[in-house]
Amino acid sequence: MLFKITFLGTSGTIPSVERNSPAIFVQFGGQRMLFDCGEGTQRQMMIAKTGFRNLDNIFITHLHTDHFIGLFGLIETMSLNERSRELNVYSPRAEVLRALFEAFGYDQLNYDIRVRELKDGEEVKFDGFKVVAFRTEHIVKSVGYAIIENDRRGKFNREKAEKELGIPPGPLYAKLARGESIVWKGRTITPDMVLGEKRRGRKVVYTGDSRPTKRTVEIARNADILIHDASFKEELKDWAIESGHSTAKEAAEVAREANVKKLILTHISTRYSKDASPLLEEAKKVFENTIIAEDFMSLEVTFDES
């Protein structure tokens, strides 16, 4: 199942020529989701060719305008494009969004908008994966989101099937590998007889704007990718604390403690718009497998077969 991330906006509070306001587009199988929706997100979607038609779920981390103001134009464009399917919007402050949508007359669109509040530990389930909200530490009420794939079936043990159970290669192998029981020579063969231990599904964690927290470390444990706020260098740590953000070094420390496979730094302050290498260098001293998010950067989350 394809699990693909596209960064639509990677700037901090203020957009720049190089970086748009925060937004991440995620495709997981047949689901298309948006995480945050800053100013100009719909145009970024047009450039990236993500499409609007199959976008049914938008997850907002907090209600600072650089993370949600792009919702309004996107919602109206969907209506003008004759959308009829319900749109789900998730946020840590549902009542505020409901009031704004009502004020903008969005109760009269040709489709319904369902706003749901998500608190720490609450989840939204999809086919094969779930999105879990987790508490973050910002200057307003905020959450991050973990995209967690269901555990996968274990690897098929061909040698055991053929030599120990006497099942010849062929269609029966495929059924067992899919988790289906079969009958061979009057005996029922269940998948657990030929499959190894379940394999952990893929996991991507996005903090939104946040200080480094134990909760982030906990939910990001062994994640394939951690996308973490890295607004400033360590020399501006006092300002990071005051404004509810993280330094690149702090993001790397979270990644190291959580034992993630890859760290992606985002929410890059305009101080570093033209050259974010100082942030990258700072983070790599703590956690080597770190990259800086760039607008329109896409990557596929692959299976770890180790």
Curated annotation (Swiss-Prot):
Keyword Metal-binding: yes
Entry's cofactor comment: Binds 2 Zn(2+) ions.
Keywords for the protein's UniProt record, in alphabetical order: Endonuclease, Hydrolase, Metal-binding, Nuclease, tRNA processing, Zinc
Annotated Zn(2+) 2 binding sites: D66, H67, D209, H267
EC number: 3.1.26.11
Taxonomic lineage of the native organism: Archaea, Methanobacteriati, Methanobacteriota, Archaeoglobi, Archaeoglobales
Pfam families listed in its UniProt record: Lactamase_B_2
GO molecular function: 3'-tRNA processing endoribonuclease activity; zinc ion binding
Entry-linked InterPro entries: Metallo-B-lactamas, RibonucZ/Hydroxyglut_hydro, RNase_Z/BN
Protein name as catalogued: Ribonuclease Z
Domain of life of the organism encoding this protein: Archaea
Source organism per UniProt: Archaeoglobus fulgidus (strain ATCC 49558 / DSM 4304 / JCM 9628 / NBRC 100126 / VC-16)
Family, as annotated: Belongs to the RNase Z family.
Top EC category: hydrolase
Reactions the enzyme catalyzes: Endonucleolytic cleavage of RNA, removing extra 3' nucleotides from tRNA precursor, generating 3' termini of tRNAs. A 3'-hydroxy group is left at the tRNA terminus and a 5'-phosphoryl group is left at the trailer molecule
Free-text function comment from the UniProt entry: Zinc phosphodiesterase, which displays some tRNA 3'-processing endonuclease activity. Probably involved in tRNA maturation, by removing a 3'-trailer from precursor tRNA.
Quaternary context: Homodimer.
Cofactor field: Zn(2+)
Binding-site list for Zn(2+) 1: H62, H64, H138, D209
Active-site residues, as the UniProt record annotates them: D66
